[in-house]
Amino acid sequence: MFVFIAGGGRTGAQLAAQLLDQNHQVRLIEHRRELLGLLHHEIPTEVIYEGIATDPDVLKQAGLSKANVLVACTN
């Protein structure tokens, strides 16, 4: 399954890690630089996309059109 996660806070990061452990394909979008550094230590870099999850260009680059599931973990 291909899961697209908007938001890389605690919930988004934990969800991404669990899904990756279960061999799912994951893309995570986060715009806060302070979280991006932490995320790169928790999940593979190729999963993480820097940007705002409402930006059409970021969504296209991250492959939203191929996703089976979209999870919003935002404030």
Residue ranges and their predicted role:
Residues 1-75:
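Cytosolic regulatory regions of ion transport systems
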